[in-house]
Amino acid sequence: MARIAGVDLPRDKRVEIALTYIYGIGRPTANVILKKTGINPDTRVKDLTEEEVAKLRDEIEKNYKVEGELRREVALNIKRLIEIGCYRGIRHRKGLPVRGQRTRTNARTRKGPRRTVGVKRKK
């Protein structure tokens, strides 16, 4: 089993698809990596030689931020926004959409389940 950047790539999938299991690598990036290393995207992971796996590993480690390093950078960016108190930081802190979406209706993914506010009747 090919292990790159701490992720076990699925053996039966094509290399192009298998690389997307690594956080920070999508289809376009996977294709660029395969083009640079000269590996056919249609090759199955189980058919890769140790040399090809080493090439992929080197290319990804040298030129791309992936997995833990990328997650840490994203978390630090969000933390910085919160600390400086900018609009986006405030939206992150309140758990609201950050990119200008409407919140009067919708935005349920970001806001979580509804908390119904009831009214009290006079007795």
From Swiss-Prot:
Disulfide bond positions: none
Top-level division of the source organism's lineage: Bacteria
Protein's name according to its UniProt entry: Small ribosomal subunit protein uS13
Entry GO terms, CC: cytosol; small ribosomal subunit
Quaternary structure and interacting proteins, as annotated: Part of the 30S ribosomal subunit. Forms a loose heterodimer with protein S19. Forms two bridges to the 50S subunit in the 70S ribosome.
A biological process term (GO) from this entry: translation
Keywords assigned: Ribonucleoprotein, Ribosomal protein, RNA-binding, rRNA-binding, tRNA-binding
Region (Disordered): 99-123
Function: Located at the top of the head of the 30S subunit, it contacts several helices of the 16S rRNA. In the 70S ribosome it contacts the 23S rRNA (bridge B1a) and protein L5 of the 50S subunit (bridge B1b), connecting the 2 subunits; these bridges are implicated in subunit movement. Contacts the tRNAs in the A and P-sites.
GO molecular function annotation: rRNA binding; structural constituent of ribosome; tRNA binding
Family, as annotated: Belongs to the universal ribosomal protein uS13 family.
Classification via Pfam families: Ribosomal_S13
